[in-house]
Curated annotation (Swiss-Prot):
Entry protein name: Cyclotide vpub-A
One Pfam family matching this protein: Cyclotide
Function, in words: Probably participates in a plant defense mechanism.
PTM info: This is a cyclic peptide.
Record-linked InterPro entries: Cyclotide, Cyclotide_bracelet_CS, Cyclotide_sf
Keywords noted in UniProt: Disulfide bond, Plant defense
Species whose genome carries this gene: Viola pubescens (Downy yellow violet)
Covalent cross-link Cyclopeptide (Gly-Asn) as placed by the record, residue numbers: G1-N31
Membership in a protein family: Belongs to the cyclotide family. Bracelet subfamily.
Any one GO BP annotation for this protein: defense response
Free-text comment on this protein's domains from its UniProt entry: The presence of a 'disulfide through disulfide knot' structurally defines this protein as a knottin.
Cystine connections: C5-C21, C9-C23, C14-C28
Length: 31
C-alpha cells in the first residue's frame, strides 16, 4: 500500500496486480 507501481487504475485494473499491486486512489500501489 505505500510503494507506487507506476501505473494508474482510472479506466482499467492494475495489470501489476500479478506482482502484488492493488488500486488505491486511482493509482496502483504495493504493500
Amino acid at each position: 500500500g505505500v510503494i507506487p507501481c507506476g501505473e494508474s487504475c482510472v479506466f482499467i485494473p492494475c495489470i501489476s496486480a500479478v506482482i502484488g499491486c492493488s488500486c488505491k486512489s486511482k493509482v496502483c500501489y504495493r504493500n
